[in-house]
A protein has these predicted regions:
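Short coil/turn motifs at beta-sheet boundaries
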Residues: 1, 16, 82, 142, ...
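Accessory, non-ATPase domains that flank or precede helicase/AAA+ motor cores in DNA-metabolism machines
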Residues: 1-314, 318-367, 379-395, 668, ...
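A general secondary-structure signal for short beta-strands and their flanking turns/coil
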Residues: 2-5, 18, 47, 432, ...
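Short, flexible, solvent-exposed loop/turn segments with mixed acidic/basic and small polar residues
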Residues: 11, 151, 639-644, 686-692
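Hydrophobic/aromatic-rich, well-ordered segments within soluble, folded domains that form packed cores
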Residues: 39, 88-91, 649-650, 654, ...
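A general secondary-structure junction signal
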Residues: 56-58, 108, 188-190, 439-441, ...
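Inter-lobe coupling/hinge segments of SF2-like helicase ATPases
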Residues: 202-209, 213, 226-663, 670-671, ...
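A carboxyl-terminal module marker
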Residues: 671, 675-695, 731-738
Length: 741
């Protein structure tokens, strides 16, 4: 028998071990070993047992065979990595900066096998005509238990083990004896754990409107001739994007293919999964972080075995092991949750496009408010642009009012509700219609503003709001500029200047005070900690158990409530002035999504946006649901300030206990890349300069070309390894970050 060798990535995340190690495959394992399996090997001088993943098999090695150690065993209770996922992991490692083992664990959403759920049944083996004679024999020999079990089997043909043991009081020895006699046999049936109670009553497909049908006709044509594109579906809120997804998936399933649907938040699960199960029945599966280990493993197994056609879930669902992948849909593609905050800091949108290219699949990116990056790709022809400009069912867009909170203060209204919003809430409560109040807290990080004139303290060098720190100073987290906190507004001289603080609990309390008869539900991180709490809150609101739903951004993501006719955005400025170059984009997206919740049924809707910055283009364009006008303003700003997508950005983040050493290393790293024709900003202190006694600093590197930044990352990694920097410091890389540091 020929020798076989395995290249193995050791399961230790350390840069010094980020390479393959060759091991000999024992003859006894040659038939069983596979690429992707987890194995146990002797590692290091002490030959300590260590796990690793097989990434390649070959007949030869490049060095002395006598020094090559043998694999000890294959880990049968661990899930292996599919071979195509190893290639994807290598791409992630190269493009985002991580070790190979970190990348492998990323593409393996389920790592441990979990015992299958099983039910035992007892089935009759003999023909029923012989049953009475056998019963007589058992009675004559006083085999009472056997007679009782046989009588039940003659009546039912098959009974559960539970019924036999609990109801009939039959022992295992009795069953074993009758099985040996050939009277019956025991059958074990495995079943999947059910992660949630979702409706699976199938419903007929909706009739598509003219715009939707045109898109599906184009998709079908492209798909049948294996022209697999990336489509950007830009549709105004309520335009029926989900119906386009469903119809496209139906086309894919007809061709024997499978589909992955990514959703941005667990809060979308209840309504989204119900819509998909109504269309495709039980062949829909769900993956999310709230599943138990067993539920998660079962859904992974269903996908691997081809028992499902559609899998729905957040970012990690991208890596399910479908064998015939035909389509990946990413709904609300602009959402920040698609970017991993853990190393490797990959973006699901970019990885799914790479995965689709590898597996011959199509991609649909959908949003009412596409990311600036995606829309730029659509305009330059990298993606195919699809647009839905009409609301489905001929529903009209809501009337939007922008309320200037500076004027409210002048009029003596110090309440968190503007006068118009109060009147409209009263009106809806009287009519028995529902209200959603949205607190735009996303990205909130202690910006300082004036309540009299709306002025926000911004960095004079970066055009980004500065953050207030406990030492009484304002800092810019991009360039490090700082200044003392002011006691009066530099624009109007008002003493009403300070940080902006507002929470959902305060809103709930204020509602009960203003409208004691109203029934209020609150949806935020505190009220959604328990499993299925999202679904329970949304279901209760949908069923009319409350008049008002108060929440953070999780309440505005794609939920349809026919009786909601009023949406209030209480403080648009909370995200608008976050110290982040994406603040304007995020504000536009959240306001547009929030406004889109009103008037989705037969009744017209109204939206109130409360702000200290009514003139800002993000607020003006969101009120009109005019994405094109917003994009024109935003891309000009990005180009002027050299932010993505006009320029590419790499963040080098480092932290450590020794501040002097951190400063020295970060200065040295900035010098390493400065001669590479790059724009290097910093090093500067991170937003939180110290956490858990770890000092934190960042360097921002910019260039028009992404590959040039990848080369800069590689150069820095080499320098870090050469100087053994990671012994004392944590260093991470983040391309085009979604959040500020």
């Amino acid at each position: 028998m020929e020798k076989l060798y395995a290249d193995i990535i050791i399961n230790i995340s350390h840069e010094a071990l980020d390479k393959v190690f060759a091991y000999k495959v024992p003859f006894s394992m040659i038939k069983d070993i596979r690429v992707g399996q987890q194995v146990v090997v002797p590692f290091g001088r002490s030959n300590k047992e260590q796990t690793g993943y097989v990434v390649n098999l070959s007949r030869t090695v490049d060095y002395d065979e006598s020094k090559v150690k043998e694999i000890l065993r294959i880990e049968t209770d661990h899930v292996g990595v599919e071979s195509n996922m190893i290639e994807l992991a290598a791409w992630i490692r190269e493009n985002y900066g991580s070790t190979m083992i970190q990348a492998l664990k990323t593409v393996l959403p389920v790592q441990e096998k979990v015992a299958r759920k099983a039910r035992k049944y007892i089935e009759l083996c003999i023909e029923k005509v012989h049953g009475p004679a056998m019963l007589d024999e058992y009675f004559s020999k006083h085999y009472v238990a056997k007679a009782r079990l046989l009588a039940a089997l003659l009546d039912h043909g098959k009974i559960s083990w539970e019924m036999a043991s609990k109801d009939l009081k039959i022992s295992k020895s009795t069953v074993d004896s009758m099985e040996r006699e050939g009277i019956l046999h025991v059958v074990t049936e495995y079943y999947y754990r059910n992660p949630g109670e979702f409706s699976i009553a199938k419903a007929e497909a909706h009739v598509l409107n003219e715009q939707q049908q045109e898109l599906i006709d184009e998709f079908r044509e492209d798909f049948l001739r294996e022209d697999h594109k990336t489509y950007l579906l830009h549709g105004i809120t309520g335009s029926g994007k989900t119906e386009v997804y469903l119809a496209a998936i139906e086309e894919v399933i007809k061709q024997g293919k499978q589909a992955i649907v990514l959703i941005p938040e667990i809060a979308l699960t209840y309504q989204t999964v119900t819509r998909f199960t109504k269309r495709f029945g039980e062949r829909v599966s769900i993956l999310n972080s709230r599943l138990s280990k067993g539920e998660r493993y079962d859904q992974w197994l269903r996908a691997q075995r081809g028992d499902v056609d559609v899998i729905i879930g957040p970012r990690s669902a991208l890596f399910v092991p479908f064998s015939n992948l035909g389509l990946i849909v990413i709904d609300e593609e602009h959402e920040g949750s698609y970017k991993s905050e853990q190393t490797p800091k990959y973006h699901a949108r970019e990885v799914e496009i790479k995965k689709a290219q590898m597996e011959g699949a199509s991609v649909i990116l959908g949003s009412a408010t596409p990311s600036v990056e995606s829309y730029k790709h659509a305009l330059d022809g990298t993606y195919r642009l699809w647009e839905l400009t009409k609301r489905a069912k001929e529903a009209v867009l809501p009337q939007v009012y922008i309320e200037d909170l500076r004027e409210e203060l002048k009029a003596g209204n110090r309440s968190m509700f503007s006068r118009r919003l109060k009147e409209l809430i009263k009106d809806r409560l009287n009519k028995g219609e529902q209200i959603m109040l949205f607190l735009n807290r996303r990205g909130y990080a202690g910006f300082v503003s004036c309540r009299s004139c709306g002025h926000v303290m911004e960095c004079p060098h970066c055009d980004i709001s500065m953050t207030y720190h406990r030492d009484g100073r304002l800092r810019c987290h991009y360039c490090g500029y700082e200044q003392p906190m002011l006691k009066v507004c530099p624009e109007c001289g008002s003493p009403y200047i300070g940080t902006f603080g507002l929470g959902t609990q305060k809103v709930e309390a204020a509602l009960y005070k203003e409208f004691p008869q109203a029934k209020v539900l609150r949806m935020d991180m505190d009220t959604t900690k328990r499993k299925n709490s999202h679904e329970q809150i949304l279901s209760a609101f949908s069923d009319g158990e409350a008049d008002i739903l108060v929440g953070t951004q999780m309440i505005v993501k794609g939920h349809d409530f026919a009786n909601v006719t009023l949406v209030g955005v209480l403080a648009a400025d909370l995200s608008l002035h976050a110290n982040d170059y994406r603040a304007g984009e995020r504000t536009f997206q959240l306001l547009t999504q929030a406004a889109g919740r009103a008037g989705r049924g037969d009744k017209p809707g109204e939206v109130v946006i409360q702000t200290y910055s009514p003139e800002h283009y993000s607020i003006q364009t969101a009120a009109k649901q005019d994405y094109h006008a917003f994009y024109k303003e935003e891309i000009s700003y990005r180009s002027l300030m050299r932010y993505p997508p006009e320029w590419q950005m790499l963040v080098v983040f480092a932290s450590g206990e020794d501040k002097a050493w951190l400063d020295k290393v970060m200065d040295a790293m900035a010098n390493v890349v400065k001669h590479m024709d790059l724009m290097v900003i910093g090093p500067s202190e991170a937003g939180f300069g110290k956490i858990n006694d770890q000092y934190r600093k960042v360097i921002y590197i910019k260039n028009k070309d992404y590959e040039t930044l990848v080369k800069a990352k590689n150069r820095l990694e080499q320098w870090i390894d050469l100087n053994k920097i990671r012994k004392n410091l944590l260093v991470n890389f983040d391309f085009n970050p979604m959040n500020s540091y």
